[in-house]
C-alpha cells in the first residue's frame, strides 16, 4: 500500500478479528482508535483507564478487553488493543503502523531544478500526467540496454 500526499486523506483497510475496517493513517497518534459506532457489539470493551489527548473532548473512552489479531493493508500480521470512542473515522496509529513496517519517504527530485522550472512554466502539474488530458505516464520509465545488439539501443 502506498499513498502520495494530496488533498485526499491517506486511508487504508485492515482486517481485525476477521472484520474489515477502513481507517485514516495517523502518524501523530500513539494508539489506534476504532469509532464506537463501528465497534461490534459482541466484542468486549472496558472503560479506559487513561484518556485520549488530541482528538477533542471524548466523553466515553473504551479499550478492547482483548489483544486482537489484525491484518494490515498488505496482509501484514499484527496485533492491536485499540481504544474505542465516538470519532467520525477510525485512526491507525503508530502501534499498528510500526508493525506494518510503515515508512514516510521524501524522495529526491528526479530532475534538475532548471528542468522542473521549465516544465512548470509549460503547465506541468506534479503528480499529473503529460498530455492534453493530463492522463499520460505519471512516473518516468527506465531505459533498458538492448543486450542482443539488435536494432536501436546498442551503444556503439
UniProtKB/Swiss-Prot annotation:
UniProt-listed InterPro entries: Aspartic_peptidase_AS, G_patch_dom, HERV-K_Pro_peptidase_A2, Peptidase_A2_cat, Peptidase_aspartic_dom_sf, Retropepsin-like_cat_dom, Retropepsins
Gene3D superfamilies: Acid Proteases
Biological process, per Gene Ontology: proteolysis; viral translational frameshifting
Pfam families: G-patch (PF01585), RVP (PF00077)
GO MF terms, alphabetically ordered: aspartic-type endopeptidase activity; nucleic acid binding
The keyword Cell membrane belongs to this UniProt entry's keyword annotation: no
UniProt keyword list: Aspartyl protease, Autocatalytic cleavage, ERV, Hydrolase, Protease, Transposable element
Reactions the enzyme catalyzes: Processing at the authentic HIV-1 PR recognition site and release of the mature p17 matrix and the p24 capsid protein, as a result of the cleavage of the -SQNY-|-PIVQ- cleavage site
Post-translational modification: Autoproteolytically processed at the N-terminus. Expected C-terminal autoprocessing not detected. The sequence shown is that of the processed Pro protein.
Family: Belongs to the peptidase A2 family. HERV class-II K(HML-2) subfamily.
Protein name: Endogenous retrovirus group K member 8 Pro protein
Organism annotation: Homo sapiens
Gene that specifies this protein: ERVK-8
Amino acid at each position: 500500500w502506498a499513498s502520495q500526499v494530496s488533498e485526499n486523506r491517506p486511508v487504508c483497510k485492515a482486517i481485525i478479528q476477521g472484520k474489515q475496517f477502513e481507517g485514516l493513517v495517523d502518524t501523530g497518534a500513539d494508539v489506534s482508535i476504532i469509532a464506537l459506532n463501528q465497534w461490534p457489539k459482541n466484542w468486549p470493551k472496558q472503560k479506559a483507564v487513561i484518556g485520549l489527548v488530541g482528538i477533542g473532548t471524548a466523553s466515553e473512552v473504551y479499550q478492547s478487553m482483548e489483544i486482537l489479531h489484525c491484518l494490515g493493508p498488505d496482509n501484514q500480521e499484527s496485533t492491536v488493543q485499540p481504544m474505542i470512542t465516538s470519532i467520525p473515522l477510525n485512526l491507525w496509529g503508530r502501534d499498528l503502523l510500526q508493525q506494518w513496517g510503515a515508512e514516510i519517504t521524501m524522495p529526491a527530485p528526479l530532475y534538475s531544478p532548471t528542468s522542473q522550472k521549465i516544465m512548470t512554466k509549460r503547465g506541468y502539474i506534479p503528480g499529473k500526467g503529460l498530455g492534453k488530458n493530463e492522463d499520460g505516464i505519471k512516473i518516468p520509465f527506465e531505459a533498458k540496454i538492448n543486450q542482443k545488439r539488435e536494432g536501436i539501443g546498442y551503444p556503439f
